[in-house]
């Protein structure tokens, strides 16, 4: 359609939700390298302890995060967005908030399975949940089968229901697979061990902070886009959606890197570890070069799938060119984070993220976008600076850490 309000509302509601959502997910990601190391060493008992504590701790964390996210609702009017956008965003946002504990329960199982090198199950579960989400959206947004037309709120309800389905499927899988049922044996809140939780936090918090800082740079840029008006906000949503499609592949390469590297690290096989790291860099560079090419050559065509508004399409096509610019550094920094997680060298990624995203990305984007008057594309230029800085600093760190591991061997 040509009315930019619903798209802007979903964009804004999603952006506000995303910041704390990503922080919670980051904490859960800390489980994978720990499980991966134990898996390489064949320690089932400790792995079971990690899973069981993860289930309890992450779900509780999900409730806590949801409470915080609910509390910030009144502040959504203070971010300089058009009032009708915020009005439509809040019911959608509430549905997302209710999904938090279910997301975290799902992630406890997902990160554990990744640690033991099983990524197929999460893929199947995610595909089923996404198909369900699409079906729910068709029903709730447009009000099929005699249900009321819910619009943006319906999109939120569809997401909530699909996020409840995912952990239920995971639990079913674990109980029906002899190989995995043992990990849940004797599961009770009594097994809650503060030492294990501290271990999970020790790995998870720096990852969480890095993801929070990175996400807030993207969200901060999105909020500044809103200052240019609804059309720019919608165009930004299009560019970010397309960017996320490319980024999904990057994220999966990063996650696979963590799994491979953590297994090599657990077996103390540094030669294999270096090979895995190099292969990941080659993969991600090839993919991101391809993505950048598509962004540039298809820049006038892609936005027409999302909007019929000529102004929105024009802005989005410019943004895609600038999104192409930061593809390579985004890929490199993501794989680098994957390697650092795998060798459990995560403390450093937080300060690197702080410098890259808050001291470079956001200020440089503001400088080009507003001070130097480049407009929306100037904001995207900030990403090139921030992501490139992150990529360089992380590579320097990895070279140092791998050299240390070699000497340690």
Residue ranges and their predicted role:
Residues 95, 129, 162-166, 170, ...:
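Transmembrane helical elements of multi-pass membrane transporters/channels
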Residues 74-75, 108-112, 131, 135-142, ...:
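Alpha-helical transmembrane segments of multipass membrane proteins
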Residues 25-28, 96-114, 122-130, 155-171, ...:
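Short runs within selected transmembrane alpha-helices of multi-pass transporters and secretion channels
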Residues 1-8, 76-83, 139-150, 212-245, ...:
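Helix-terminus/linker motif at the lipid-water interface of multi-pass membrane proteins
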Residues 4-15, 89, 93, 156, ...:
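Small-residue hotspots at the loop-to-helix junctions and early N-terminal turns
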